[in-house]
Amino acid sequence: MADTITPSELHTLLAAGNVTLLDVRRCADRAAAPQGIPGATWKDPELVESWGDELPREKPVVIYCVRGGSVSSSVQSALRGKNLDVTFVEGGLAAWDASK
């Protein structure tokens, strides 16, 4: 899988049901704006080493943060280090919201 995915591509994956979607926004960002992408499971990006091994390997993993920047990139790197197929949403939650 590529490094990033567009909101449009994510819509397609979600419709097919063939993706594990994770909200990796920092705690403070999530508390300030709790509404995320429907179907996503929140995981604390600061604790990626503790939950990364629990992710299913049979489906690709898509992650998102607020803007698709450093948080997504660092979580992606950590999960790829665990041999997971991981992409993140270009522009993060902001781009997803703008695409609706």
What does each of the following model-derived ranges do?
Residues 1-19, 24-62, 67-100:
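Rhodanese-like catalytic fold shared by cysteine-dependent sulfurtransferases
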